[in-house]
């Protein structure tokens, strides 16, 4: 099953995340199928390709709770 979830990168105590599509059995920082966005909790910025998100959800990928919240916030801003 495909999941849309966060992949951590950045420095110590300065997390940033990539929003990725990945097989649910793979590790958090494993190789993604596709990268569809970016999220930085420190300055609360995000950039998401909504077309790709909707395409992947239509194909059966399930977003995690946090990713769903980030997508909702991004849609409200734009």
Swiss-Prot record:
PROSITE patterns named among the record's database cross-references: RIBOSOMAL_S16
GO cellular component: chloroplast; mitochondrion; small ribosomal subunit
One Pfam assignment: Ribosomal_S16
GO molecular function: structural constituent of ribosome
Subcellular location: Plastid, Chloroplast
InterPro entries hit by this protein: Ribosomal_bS16, Ribosomal_bS16_CS, Ribosomal_bS16_dom_sf
Keywords, ordered alphabetically: Chloroplast, Plastid, Ribonucleoprotein, Ribosomal protein
GO biological process, one term: mitochondrial translation
Segments forming a coiled coil: none
Annotated Gene3D superfamilies: 3.30.1320.10
Family indicated by similarity: Belongs to the bacterial ribosomal protein bS16 family.
Record HAMAP family: Ribosomal_bS16
NCBIfam families cross-referenced by the UniProt entry: S16 (TIGR00002)
PANTHER family (UniProt xref): 30S RIBOSOMAL PROTEIN S16, SMALL RIBOSOMAL SUBUNIT PROTEIN BS16M
Stated name of the protein: Small ribosomal subunit protein bS16c
Organism (species): Gracilaria tenuistipitata var. liui
Lineage: Eukaryota, Rhodophyta, Florideophyceae, Rhodymeniophycidae, Gracilariales
């Amino acid at each position: 099953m495909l999941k849309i979830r966060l992949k951590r990168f950045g420095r110590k105590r300065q997390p940033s995340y990539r929003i990725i599509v990945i097989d649910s059995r793979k590790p958090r920082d494993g190789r993604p199928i596709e990268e569809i966005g970016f999220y930085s909790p420190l300055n609360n910025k995000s950039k998401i390709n909504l077309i790709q998100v909707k395409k992947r959800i239509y194909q059966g990928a399930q977003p995690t709770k946090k990713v769903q919240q980030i997508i909702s916030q991004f849609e409200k801003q734009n």
